[in-house]
Amino acid sequence: MERHTTLGEFIIENQKDFPYAKGELSALLSSIRLAGKVVNQQINKAGLAEILGKAGKENVQGESQAKLDVLANEIFVSTLRNRGEICGLASEELEDYLVFDEEMHKNAEYIVLIDPLDGSSNIDVDITVGTIFSIYRRISKKGTPATLEDFLQPGINQVAAGYLIYGTSTILVYTTGNGVNGFTFDPGIGSFFLSHSDIKFPKKGNTYSVNEGNYVHFPQGIKKYIKWVQELNEEENRPFTSRYTGSLVADFHRNMLLGGIYLYPQGTTAPKGKLRLLYECNPMAFLAEQAGGKATDGSRRIMELQPQELHERAPFICGNKEMVEKAEEFMQ
């Protein structure tokens, strides 16, 4: 019987490739893995445990929170707080960042930004959802409380990023800047096993993911690009196929494996875009670039944008490098 590498083994084996290898990052990734397993368990029994539906609250963006949004956030916060690898955490679900100032956190080198449950509007109808995370080294002095400056770093400073996808199977995908690897959860054993090694975007793609219900609000360049992908051209394998679920993790994962582009541009109803730069755009951009793809706001590299606030939004175009560059041509 073929033996598969577990996520824990893979993290330890590849720790030497990380420039600051001391073990803390490996332990932090293990903590995220643990929290993801708990969230996955809650999602699988959500209908029976009466944790579907809305929580009756709004997050900082004014969006209605699902009960599982709140629960997933609590699980990640409590799991990471109970370990000593980070000095602070910022979540899409919380207005301000959290400072972990207990004794075990005083010398922690890392901070985490997280979207605990991406695509949660889909949860009640059993469509794939996910968790997105991003890890940075702190800027502030060790031994002092985390500061806002620690969180407002450009994406190029990320030391690790990834996502968990809770679908027909549960998969954890992450990068530390040395390629992208995916691990599938075996519920019978309770472990993640390497299933997608050194993931790369296919050179060509023919899928586009965009909410065409917002077409009337899009800038002219995006409208022209959408018309272009829908035109018949056998040499260029057009028209492309439209696939959009409303779950960034699900759409990104499919496009990275099969080839495609994801677009959530600015528009008249969302002049700065809708996706959050720190919690969604930066980690997905890091993964995309490590998989040979590209991520832009239409003209600028996503990971070079300097955040000004925790919940800043940005236009987001991400996928096969060739497809993204073609979309950029229409945006000029």
UniProtKB/Swiss-Prot annotation:
It is found in: Cytoplasm. The lineage of its organism: Bacteria, Pseudomonadati, Bacteroidota, Flavobacteriia, Flavobacteriales. Substrate binds at D118, G119, S120, S121, N211, Y244, Y262, L263, Y264, K274. Belongs to the FBPase class 1 family. Binds 2 magnesium ions per subunit. Its cofactor is Mg(2+). Its main location: cytoplasm. HAMAP family: FBPase_class1. Homotetramer. It catalyses: beta-D-fructose 1,6-bisphosphate + H2O = beta-D-fructose 6-phosphate + phosphate. Its EC number is 3.1.3.11. This is Fructose-1,6-bisphosphatase class 1 1. One of its GO terms (molecular function) is magnesium ion binding. One of its GO terms (cellular component) is cytosol. Mg(2+) 1 binds at E92, D115, L117. Mg(2+) 2 binds at D115, D118, E280. The keyword Cytoplasm applies. Pathway: Carbohydrate biosynthesis; gluconeogenesis. GO terms for biological process: fructose 1,6-bisphosphate metabolic process; fructose 6-phosphate metabolic process; fructose metabolic process; gluconeogenesis; sucrose biosynthetic process. Keywords: Carbohydrate metabolism, Cytoplasm, Hydrolase, Magnesium, Metal-binding.
